[in-house]
């Protein structure tokens, strides 16, 4: 990895698939992401204490996430939130970057990551809601050469995190 290593928090908002969540945890652990915030209806691993979900549901989701996370869900600190805590992160000095295709998005290879960055990922089909896009300090996009208009959210997260952490 490069000498410069920004502090990155991933916000996984309204991601439906436990397999995508697990893959994001595994990639985040491998690249040294500080923590993950699972917001909206994003499934998350069992909490160590006071998990508000029914025990059988928490166990089921944790097992499903573990299939792709392979233990990374136990190593990467995470929190849950009904909405992405953008104001609190900004107050802590984080720049909020949404990973989204948008005419105002900066191509990821042209973006210089600040020392503290919160990377917002949106749902698999619709991406980041327009209101949340507006709330971001910057939108980033992964340039595409193919005819499809998007990558899988966990794949996009991996490409973006690698670029931000290793090639910045």
Segments from the language model and where they lie:
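RNA substrate-binding interface of SAM-dependent RNA methyltransferases
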Residues: 1-101, 165
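Short acidic active-site motifs
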Residues: 84-85, 107-109, 128
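Structured adenosyl-cofactor binding patch, chiefly the S-adenosyl-L-methionine
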Residues: 130-168
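Short, glycine/polar-rich helix-capping loops at beta-to-alpha or helix-loop-helix junctions
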Residues: 61-66, 126-132
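Short amphipathic alpha-helical segments
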Residues: 23-24, 50, 109-111, 131-134
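Short beta->alpha connector loops at strand-helix junctions that form conserved
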Residues: 13, 39-40, 100, 123, ...
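A contiguous loop/helix-start segment that scaffolds small-molecule binding in enzyme catalytic cores
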Residues: 116-117
């Amino acid at each position: 990895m490069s000498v410069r290593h920004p502090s990155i928090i991933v916000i996984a908002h309204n991601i439906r698939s436990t397999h995508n969540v697990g893959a994001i945890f595994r990639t985040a652990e491998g690249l040294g992401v500080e923590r993950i915030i699972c917001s909206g209806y994003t499934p998350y691993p069992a909490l160590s204490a006071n998990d508000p979900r029914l025990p059988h549901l928490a166990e089921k989701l944790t097992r499903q996430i573990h299939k792709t996370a392979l233990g990374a869900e136990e190593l990467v600190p995470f929190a849950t939130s009904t909405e992405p805590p953008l104001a609190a992160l900004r107050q802590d000095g984080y720049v909020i970057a949404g990973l989204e295709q948008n005419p105002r998005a900066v191509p990821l290879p042209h973006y210089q990551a600040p020392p503290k960055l919160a990377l917002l990922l949106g749902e698999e089909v619709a991406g980041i809601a327009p209101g949340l896009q507006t709330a971001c300090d910057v939108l980033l996009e992964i340039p595409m050469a193919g005819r499809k208009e998007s990558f899988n959210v966990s794949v996009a997260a991996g490409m973006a995190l690698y670029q931000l952490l290793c090639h910045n």
